Design a protein with these regions (language model features):
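Short, charged, surface-exposed hinge/linker loops at domain edges
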Residues: 1-5, 32, 36-68
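Short aromatic-glycine-(Arg/Gly/Cys) micro-motifs in beta-strand/loop hairpins
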Residues: 6-21
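A short, exposed loop/beta-hairpin motif centered on an aromatic-Gly-Thr core
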Residues: 22-31
Length: 68
């Protein structure tokens, strides 16, 4: 399981990224599409790491909300 950030991007697209996997970013026309796309991106990222015999990064982020 991986934490994913989803937020509105440019041109009415949604951006999704996985902070524990550097460079693992995707987008979609809707929030739901962005989530589907980032899931595929994460799966591909992990397969590439395994294929290249590279270590799979641990999930190491805490999500916090800060009142300002």
């Amino acid at each position: 399981m991986r934490q994913v950030l989803v937020y509105p991007g440019e041109d009415d697209y949604w951006v999704a990224e996985c902070p524990s996997l550097p460079g693992c970013v995707s987008q979609g026309k809707t929030r739901e599409e962005a989530l589907v796309n980032i899931k595929e991106a994460i799966e591909g990222y992990l397969v590439a790491l395994e294929t290249d015999h590279l270590p799979i990064p641990e999930e190491h982020f805490d999500a916090l909300l800060v009142a300002v």
